[in-house]
Amino acid sequence: MRRVGIAVAAGIALADASIVTLGLPSILVELRATVEGVALVLGVYTAVLAVALLPAVWLCRRFGDAPVGAAGFGLFLVASLGCGASNSLGLLLVLRGVQALGGAAGLVAAFALLDGGRAGPGRRLWVAASVFGIAIGPALGGALTQAFSWRAIFFAQAPIVLPGLLVALQVARTEPADAAVRDPGGSSPFPWRAAISLALLSASLTAVVFLVVLLLVSGWSIEPLAAALAVSVLPVAAIASSRLPGDPEIRAVSGCLLVAGGVGCLALLPGASAWWTVIPQLLAGAGMGLALPALSGELIPERTRLDSAKLLSIRHAGIAVALAALAPLISSNLTSTIDTAREQGTAAVLDAKLPPEKKIEIAPDLFGGLNTDDPRGQLQKEIDKAKAGLSGDEATEMGNLGNRLDEVVTGAVRSAFRPTFIVTSALALLAALILLTGSGPAAAALTRPAVATAAIAALVAAGGYGIAYANSARETVKIGDPCEDRQLPGVGGISGALQDISLAALDRAACKFGSSREELLLALFDDRLQHKFEEEHGVNPRDLLSLGPAILGF
């Protein structure tokens, strides 16, 4: 039972990324962070862990596994409590680095204390620690975030690590004096081809863990617990496929191909529903279960502390690099696509057959303050507010408008995430190609039934999602040229006539400024967009000396 405590503590340190990921959207809002900022919450931990694992091997050789393990788990516990109490992103990131230092020491020591390099109960517990973390991480993180807050994720880690800390302290008191210099043999020659493939595969799997959660919770405003259940498909599929036998190189190649196909399907999501992510996650999870065990411990030996440290460093370095590269890309894409969605949504409002006073009331609120934190959730709140007091045809028109605006925003979010999914799918495919360049069984892998089946499954799934994506394409809201004549809403009555006159005047001004009428209207109501308009078009849209003559056509 003492070993179980060590294994559970190691499992939490290994599962950190999958647990914490579900809290990132809440951190994004509460700490007023950016996408790059919340990516660092994972990135700092994985990067520091990757760097600290090899020095931790030296510490274990110098001072003994149990003392280093106790110190590591103790540091991890204290830092976890500090993370939960953090009131700024900067402090949280510092403590995440401290947490990773403790995690690195604890993991290297745990491998030796469990005797993870030899076949038997210790090895099974070491492997179970990884599986345990992968399996419970998403569900635990989502449940804690929804029931309490993101802080509960870190507070909950402390009591889970505590038994491992106590066991390590107990072993340290009884460990032989010469334990500090013992080592179960030297490391084997390092297989760099498999190592590079492992790093690329780990980077690709980041898309399924980090990006899917961000897409579901921040992009599509799905509750954390529902998102946790959705992404739990990945570990379930991984655990199921990890039991399949076969040559490790064949399993590794097959797994990489399945991950590439699954992540590729995520780039072709036809709708804003968590259900559309299930099949891609099943593919990626099955690939993960095939490839990771084959690469970790089989193609890349894991017989000593140094072997284990190298292997974990490679995995976490791949994750850290992926986060560092993908976060700025997704942030830039979100900003760009939300700006486009803001203009398209405003165009839809202006063209809707609603009274002009209602348009004036809702247009700035619907899209003026729309940002990348939770665009769909913000939009839905404003739509619900706009529906209040409407009845009859106006209520119906507002309902139709709401549906169209929802399609605009969710489509923009999918477009923002698409390039990152394409890139990470390519990483998994590259991992498979690198394995195929070897001289072992993988060199002739394409002729093997397992690899052929994986390749066909990936292609069929990607093709099916491609067809569904093409068929789901709806007519986009077009931003009209203000310099050309266009059909006006024409709702009738005096107010309708005044509305048409106002829109025509807005077109004249936008034409003179070289902008769209939607861009001009938003700039009139939103300070940030006003400054952006002035930078792009060289004129202050709120300056009456500029706006007045432009409206009159002078």
Model-assigned labels for residue ranges:
Residues 1, 361-453:
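Transmembrane-helix exit segments and adjacent C-terminal regions of multi-pass membrane proteins
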Residues 2-24, 32-36, 41-45, 50, ...:
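12-transmembrane solute porter fold
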Residues 30-32, 64, 85-91, 102, ...:
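Helix-breaking motifs and short loop linkers at transmembrane-helix boundaries and internal kinks
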Residues 66-69, 76, 92, 252:
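Primarily marks hydrophobic transmembrane alpha-helices of the MFS/SLC 12-helix fold
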Residues 97-130:
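Cytoplasmic helix-loop-helix junction between adjacent transmembrane helices
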Residues 129-168:
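Helix-loop-helix hairpin linking two adjacent transmembrane segments in secondary transporters
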